[in-house]
Amino acid sequence: MSRFCLLFVAFGFVLYFLHMEVTGKRTREDILKEAEQKGPEIKAMILENVQKCKTNCALHLKYEKCNELVPECCPKETPKCKSV
């Protein structure tokens, strides 16, 4: 019984990671981990861009969401943009 449970959990993790790879969804933590590997200057630049993006989105009512990967505001109807 416990082997079946472990197999089921492992299969769930595999499906989850495959889904993340296929859809291209990455979390803020994933982005920061990659930035840390590239060096402190790159990480600082990414954090600065995300902060600028948050500020810009707050200033314009028609833009409410911020895309972490590209430091620009996205229209509300753009599905791949997400809140930061």
UniProtKB/Swiss-Prot annotation:
Keywords: Disulfide bond, Secreted, Signal, Toxin
Domain of life: Eukaryota
Coiled coil residues, start to end: none
Record PTM text: Contains 3 disulfide bonds.
Signal sequence segment: 1-24
Cellular-component GO terms for this entry: extracellular region
Subcellular location: Secreted
One Gene Ontology molecular-function label: toxin activity
UniProt tissue specificity: Expressed by the venom gland.
Similarity comment text for this entry: Belongs to the scoloptoxin-10 family.
Name this polypeptide is given: U-scoloptoxin(10)-Er1a
Organism placement in taxonomy: Eukaryota, Metazoa, Ecdysozoa, Arthropoda, Myriapoda
